[in-house]
Amino acid sequence: MLPRGRPRAMGAAVLLLLLLLVVGFFLFGRDPDYGLGTTATLDEDPYRSRNLSASSPQLLLPPKCEMLHVAIVCAGYNSSREIITLTKSLLFYRKNPLHLHLITDAVARNILETLFRTWMVPAVVVSFYDAEELKPLVSWIPNKHYSGLYGLMKLVLPSILPPSLARVIVLDTDVTFSSDIVELWALFDHFSDKQVVGLVENQSDWYLGNLWKNHRPWPALGRGFNTGVILLWLDRLQQTGWEQMWKVTAKRELLTLMATSLADQDIFNAVIKEHPHLVHPLPCVWNVQLSDHTRAERCYLEAADLKVIHWNSPKKLRVKNKHAEFFRNLHLTFLGYDGKLLRRELFGCPNQFPPGAEQLQQALTQLDEEEPCFEFRQQQLTVHRVHITFLPHQPPPPQPHDVTLVAQLSMDRLQMLEALCRHWPGPMSLALYLTDEEAQQFLHFVETSPVLSMRKDVAYHVVYRDGPLYPVNQLRNVALAQALTPYVFLSDIDFLPAYSLYDYLRASIEQLELDSRRKTALVVPAFETLHYRFSFPNSKAELLTLLDAGSLHTFRYHEWPQGHSSTDYSRWREAQAPYSVQWSADYEPYVVVPRDCPRYDPRFVGFGWNKVAHIIELDAQEYEFLVLPEAFSIHLPHAPSLDISRFRSSPTYRNCLQALKEEFHQDLSRRYGSAALKYLTALQQARSRA
């Protein structure tokens, strides 16, 4: 007979054994091949609880000054926009220095080098790698995915990243962070000695093969893994013979599957199916996948659980999802977030400043905020973020006499773009001064316009708003620097050129036998109408009829006649051939010049003297001004800008402009010596007349 306490002990032992069997079933009973024992699947509640533990207090974070490394493959115009939103979300939450390793094509590199150089974010290092070097390594793999060859390049990252780099987080451009990336980096410490890659389980049934009839996916463990967020332990990867491993697997599977459907993700999963010990499953909140067939809602309970949102559907923000509106709003928050605010982060780490930022900050702190012209001085020192070729752009084939129209505008002038495209069939380079939010409105405006969406030879460059004064000459310089043709027509957005002007300018350049060695500025006579609706003249004869009838006027004839008087409109009426004119004080014609002409003086911001200074520079460099007899451009009426209103109403504003003029002439004297005396004399005479 057993002692009275013995049955209770045996009962407890049986219960404990049953509990262990249940736990073992959950950990190891899901899939004969899925013996990872580290996380549960989307179909099971334990998965949710374990994944939500990612932010638990037990997570040991690296030191605050440890550099975190992030690799991103980015190609083309659209991905270059996507990566900015991703970067904003990264920077918003991060507390560690970041080193971004960007594998780019030539288009993306040109865009992103300019953007990050002008963004000047502290404690961020950016390195670029040429994606062309990786193409031969993956071009043998047929790929049905819309990402093309670039979607396979994560397989070969170890061959292009520095050998000294041990660990890196690899991201797709279509992810948005809602947490500090250092928490993700800390998960490297959870890897076993044999694990080389960290991935989140795929959150759809794609790899189960039951989405539609005869669907045959690549092999995977259970649901497989998604490669939108990857933790790569690079040195271990090399030691395992990764290159040989994935190539052998890919070649074997391609014998029957013929092509990848999900690019690198298919090959990663096939390798992991064969070598499950290589993968460390990550908590699902680090890659909440919003694909067409996602079951991601099983991963999170509330917004605080989310770490990374992955828009991995071709539909992107238009994907149908139970919580799509919430995710969309989170993404749109960063889309419209003012990127300049991310410059002001405080890091107690050495070498946190980007090149030139420390000197710039010192110059700004030396300014006297009580000085009347403080705004002008501050604006001169402002470095604006610049996103060149904001939209897809197809430059025209090179032609020896081709001309690009160059102009700048702000949001309130967008309505001019369609009319300008109808009048000018040639290439254009336009700089837009916008906030981050306005840039998205502009994007929508172009995409929904039948006229603008068809014009791929128009390059739009966004200069992000920063400061109270309009940086007109910096905008012009941005647009001018991005022109790709031998000649440029330096215009303004409120002007519509004659319908025939583009062809006429090219023919004139050829007939006059101009080349870059001949310093010539072709003057396009400027006119204006005070009517919002009028019949645009198709020829010089029609224009003269409207001029005689009082429907048109020479530009600014009643406010600023000296600005265009040297063009000599009386002579132009009768002219049959180009004629030469001399510079005079305050002359500011619209001209066609070689692309390598002098840049505009960026000290002139707001309203006043910005074009005048440029024409003086052309004259000082001995450009000849030739007026074209059949050319014309017409200014349309519009509401006055804020800057011109301030110029008219504020004596301080006008005094500051006068101070800038004097500084400009002092610089001219230093550069051109006695040859610049005539410009100073003209300025003094104009001041005495005033």
Curated annotation (Swiss-Prot):
The chain crosses the membrane at residues 9-29. Its cofactor is Mn(2+). Residues 344-686 are annotated as: Glucuronyltransferase activity. Mn(2+) 1 binds at D172, D174. It is a single-pass type II membrane protein. Highly expressed in the testis and kidney, but weakly expressed in the heart and brain. Expressed during embryogenesis from 7 dpc. One of its GO terms (molecular function) is dystroglycan binding. Keywords: Glycoprotein, Glycosyltransferase, Golgi apparatus, Manganese, Membrane, Metal-binding, Multifunctional enzyme, Signal-anchor, Transferase, Transmembrane, Transmembrane helix. Its EC number is 2.4.-.-, 2.4.2.-, 2.4.1.-. Mn(2+) 2 binds at D492, D494. It is found in: Golgi apparatus membrane. It comes from the Eukaryota. Pathway: Protein modification; protein glycosylation. Its main location: Golgi. GO terms for biological process: protein O-linked mannosylation. Interacts with B4GAT1. In the C-terminal section; belongs to the glycosyltransferase 49 family. In the N-terminal section; belongs to the glycosyltransferase 8 family. PANTHER family: GLYCOSYLTRANSFERASE-RELATED, XYLOSYL- AND GLUCURONYLTRANSFERASE LARGE2. Bifunctional glycosyltransferase with both alpha-1,3-xylosyltransferase and beta-1,3-glucuronyltransferase activities involved in the maturation of alpha-dystroglycan (DAG1) by glycosylation leading to DAG1 binding to laminin G-like domain-containing extracellular proteins with high affinity and in a phosphorylated-O-mannosyl trisaccharide dependent manner. Elongates the glucuronyl-beta-1,4-xylose-beta disaccharide primer structure by adding repeating units [-3-Xylose-alpha-1,3-GlcA-beta-1-] to produce a heteropolysaccharide. Supports the maturation of DAG1 more effectively than LARGE1. This is Xylosyl- and glucuronyltransferase LARGE2. It comes from Mus musculus. The gene is Large2.
